[in-house]
């Protein structure tokens, strides 16, 4: 049953990434991501790498609020907690990072994606 639930979470999380996509098309967000100022966290949310400016904090907060709303809806639809669903989404977002983008490693440090697979949390499905 756990494997089935995890499979459902993975499938559902794959669909959710498009949900906050409009906010993530913001040129300021794209510039921050390309500059390594923001990165994907294993908890499913966007994080600030280094010093935060008010504008960068606003962008990250806006995206994370939208992500949380999607996670809440999808978690309820899939009989999971928001945290379970968000982590599954975070694992997938980290797996999809492009070379040069930042992500949070399992130890909490920020890494820059290389051509090798990213370090993933052992709890990732």
Predicted regions and their residues:
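N-terminal secretory signal peptides that target proteins for export/translocation
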Residues: 1-3
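Bacterial N-terminal signal peptides
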Residues: 7-16
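N-terminal signal peptide c-region/cleavage motif recognized by signal peptidases
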Residues: 18-20
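Amphipathic, charged alpha-helical segments and their helix-to-coil junctions
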Residues: 24-40, 45-58, 86-125
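Surface-exposed patches in mature extracellular/periplasmic domains of secreted proteins
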Residues: 59, 71-89
